[in-house]
Amino acid sequence: MSINIFNPFKDLIFDEQFCFLTGELTTEKMSVYPDWLMDHFKFRDDRIEMMDKSKVYRYGDLQLPCSKRVKDAFETLDETFREAFKKGYETVAALDEHLLFLWTGRMVYGMLYYEMRYENERMMKLRERFDLSPMLRERFANFHLMLQSIVEPVVFVGRKPWSIAVFPLKYSADIFSYRDDTVNLLFQFGVNGFGLIACLQDNGVLGEKQKDILSSLQKSLRMVKK
């Protein structure tokens, strides 16, 4: 039996009545950033700019239309990551990379979704057609397909399509450092205890190149603990 996989980048479909991940009609919503993360680090009311700096949102206002099964799947994932976060670096580092990809990818794609909606609305006001280059359509469509693996039978064969590194990090306070790049699909995240860097669509190239550096970081942590 064939499965129809939703690709919003084929016809640039980003309407609020369709689930961002599966394309199902829905009235449900989920936050771009995990609620527990916004509450713990108190950035729900902070502001974030779109890439061209002309549009500003509150983090807490960023919502994605989603089907119930997608919302449930991400809530389960959030709980897994929240429990690992409480226990610290070693527990987070031991998580399956696929789970780390889904957790980081949800935020990066969420911001990409808002960039697409904003750009579409901006072009409509100018009475111009919103479009993307073939290269970006393919890159974003592949990323979206990978994210669908949280609810659909998407299988990764051979080399992992991402590079993800978790490493020890020490801050002087319980703070939150975060950056993303929606065009290049990059994610950087740091808290007191560990940092996480994800290149979400590089076919594992960066992870292979930085293997020795990450191994040294992890070895240093073990030596300090002895």
Feature names for model-found ranges:
Residues F41-F43, M50-M51, G88-E90, L126, ...:
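Short, surface-exposed linear patches
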Residues C19-T22, S67, T104, F189, ...:
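Generic structural hydrophobic/aromatic packing signal, biased to beta-strands
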